[in-house]
Amino acid sequence: MCSAGQLLGGGGGGGGSGGERDEDRDALAERAAAGTEQESGASPRRRGRRPLEEREQDIEESQNHTGEPVGDDYKKMGTLFGELNKSLLNMGFTRMYFGEQIVEPVIVIFFWVMLWFLGLPAFGLVALLCLVIIYVQQ
């Protein structure tokens, strides 16, 4: 049997020429590999490819803007109220339904705190103001 070097070299015999040819081929292969690495790293746009980080960022952006409704609707209220509302719902508070209007637990707690600090007359005034604003927007 013959080795892979002998098959590639085309010769089966001895001498130092077979070994030298293998070393030359190895050096050429290393230079070629180094050249392709430099080309691919130097200008990825020239070959029609973009770096991996940019491709991942584009994928994330396309997934965020798919046009589908967002499952977590607490983003509408802002981060602080949304997170508080999510925590209250997880603790067992429920949403209150007044006809077509849905009142989130964080709003109910907010009005209870206002009642505690401001008293009944101020609470009634603010509640009336909120109801007027809701019906004027419709």
UniProtKB/Swiss-Prot annotation:
Disulfide bonds: none annotated. Residues 7-18 have a biased composition (Gly residues). It holds the Pfam family DUF4605. The chain crosses the membrane at residues 106-126. It is a single-pass membrane protein. Its main location: membrane. It comes from the Eukaryota. This is Uncharacterized protein FAM241A. The lineage of its organism: Eukaryota, Metazoa, Chordata, Craniata, Vertebrata.
